[in-house]
Design a protein with these regions (language model features):
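N-terminal alpha-helical interaction modules that lie
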Residues: 1-79, 83-91, 173, 177-206
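Alpha-helical linker/edge segments of TPR/alpha-solenoid repeat scaffolds
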Residues: 11-14, 123-137, 164-175, 202-206
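Residue signature of alpha-solenoid helical repeat architecture, marking inter-repeat boundaries
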Residues: 31-32, 75, 113-117, 151-155
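The tetratricopeptide repeat
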Residues: 36, 73, 80, 118-121, ...
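Residue at a conserved register position within TPR or TPR-like alpha-solenoid repeats
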Residues: 44-45, 81, 88, 126-129, ...
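Short coil/turn linking the two alpha-helices of tandem helical-hairpin repeats
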Residues: 46-50, 112, 126-132, 171, ...
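Hydrophobic, well-structured mid-protein blocks that either form specific transmembrane helices
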Residues: 88-135
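TPR/TPR-like (Sel1-like) alpha-helical repeat modules
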Residues: 98-106, 133-145, 168-191
Length: 206
């Protein structure tokens, strides 16, 4: 076992838990402690076994409930909420996903944590669960972020997929089609430079 593998277990048992808890108890730094706990939980949430998934959810709840909202912990709480949001989004429980993404964005506003993925998940789950009150904030974020935060193809894809969904939900169907077209182009693996040029030409049409 590598030195970092003790908090990256993909299987779970009583013996594994005892070993994990023993190592975790040796960590005195709250940032590291909550990070180890969150990372281990994220591995368990990726399991196909519902029992192991529930253990992962319990660990995420530990991060969120058992530690204070201080600078050393806030980033791991933010990531925990995003991880839980992603888990429920994959299960198509969009209401629960929305609740967790919304809480994550609340941390973002408090501590200027920047993670586009949380906003994209928030917007997509808001559309699926019909939280229309979230649409104005989602639209503002998407339009403000377009030319500043998009660096990688995965970010561009997620951004324009969320944009397409939100524009369709508010009745701006032509813009939704343009955004959907961009997300499809990303799936064809066009280069980031080419993509960014194309995105700005779309922006000018709005």
């Amino acid at each position: 076992m590598g030195q970092h593998d003790w908090y990256r277990n993909k299987e779970w048992s009583e013996d594994i838990e005892l070993a994990f808890r023993a190592r975790l108890s040796r960590s005195r730094d709250l940032y590291n402690k909550t990070q180890y706990l969150r990372i281990q939980a994220s591995y368990l949430l990726s399991s196909s076994d519902p029992t192991i998934q529930n253990v992962g959810l319990g660990m995420m709840n530990e991060v969120l409930s058992d530690y204070p909202d201080i600078d050393d912990v806030i980033f791991n709480k933010f990531d925990a909420l995003v991880n839980v949001g992603d888990f429920f989004y994959r299960r198509e429980d969009f209401e629960t996903a929305y609740i967790n993404y919304k809480k994550a964005i609340g941390y973002d506003k408090k501590k200027t944590v920047v993670q586009d993925h949380a906003y994209h998940g928030f917007i997509k789950s808001a559309v699926f669960s019909k939280h229309e009150e979230a649409y104005p904030a989602g639209l503002k974020y998407l339009e403000d972020a377009r030319d500043t935060n998009l660096l990688f193809l995965s970010e561009i894809y997620d951004h324009y997929l969320a944009s397409a969904m939100l524009y369709a939900a508010i009745g701006r169907h032509e813009t939704a089609k343009e955004c959907a077209s961009v997300s499809l182009r990303v799936l064809n693996e066009e280069s980031p430079l080419h993509m960014k040029s194309g995105l700005r030409s779309i922006d000018r049409k709005r």
